[in-house]
């Protein structure tokens, strides 16, 4: 492992955040001698970010922990176009009202990760709509457009991939990388920003911003990207068969959020503890070394630590208590998904769909046929099975890790 002089790059390296850097030696030297403002952009494509964005949010947290200044850039302007990087087709355009509502909803998450204020290392949040919405087309083309080579833009993997597949890339989308580059230059002027960070898919956009800032202002700025994060089975972070694992409390119950982390593959436990918690590295090494059924204790620690960070102490405690009641004591935790039944009975298929364990009746039937459905711990293999609902709560399970409650309405 490379030895760095700055606490910032040492921290990022030790915890596995670094994929690529521009001029690592110069960035290391700068970070060792002064406070660096650094930013990451988040486009408001939904009312909540999901777990797939957590590496970037944690990267801003690490920046602040190392004594530097995080800048959260909300893409109120670029969100009107949509980032085409490595997408097979154009994003659906959102109205201005939807974008504004999404920005307002997303903002609250960052307060759990970062300290905001007016101090030299306090985080700030800005919106690129503040400058992009004011651009005039002809002056922008003359001042900024001259610094971009279309030939080079076509060579970036994110663009080349679409063209090689003969998939349409609109002029609107093609302009996204220019606007993102302009963001870096604008933040350099407004906030003395010297660093842009992002996922590995943003490398081309980051390099464009570095070059634009150098050409227009003669300022040296830097870029860092994180590795593409997938689970051990090759799945993308933040998505499950049931949908996205949202960060906002109103988008996903704390129990489901906690359970996502508790279900982590054994092979991912150490990596996720380093990336998504503040636990000391020696403690992570101890947890990562656990084998057999003991690794489950490390998964509970992971679930508790991440849920505490994202949802708060009480949510983490409640989720763990629900898990203990459900799995250890055979009881029913209070935070499990619940379905109120108005009739005296309900079919197993309808119960599975109603509890969110299957997206459709067909999927529920396949789950039953495959032996994945249980009622109060007993397997159900008949898709026509009816569950009698009385004053007693009934546990319905999908596989070993998903549990819900049926209650009389």
Curated annotation (Swiss-Prot):
PROSITE patterns: S4. Pfam families: S4 (PF01479), tRNA-synt_1b (PF00579). L-tyrosine binds at residues 39, 176, 180. Its main location: cytoplasm. It is an enzyme of class 6 (ligase). It comes from the Bacteria. It is found in: Cytoplasm. ATP binds at residue 239. PANTHER family: TYROSINE--TRNA LIGASE, MITOCHONDRIAL, TYROSYL-TRNA SYNTHETASE. Belongs to the class-I aminoacyl-tRNA synthetase family. TyrS type 1 subfamily. This is Tyrosine--tRNA ligase. It comes from Novosphingobium aromaticivorans (strain ATCC 700278 / DSM 12444 / CCUG 56034 / CIP 105152 / NBRC 16084 / F199).
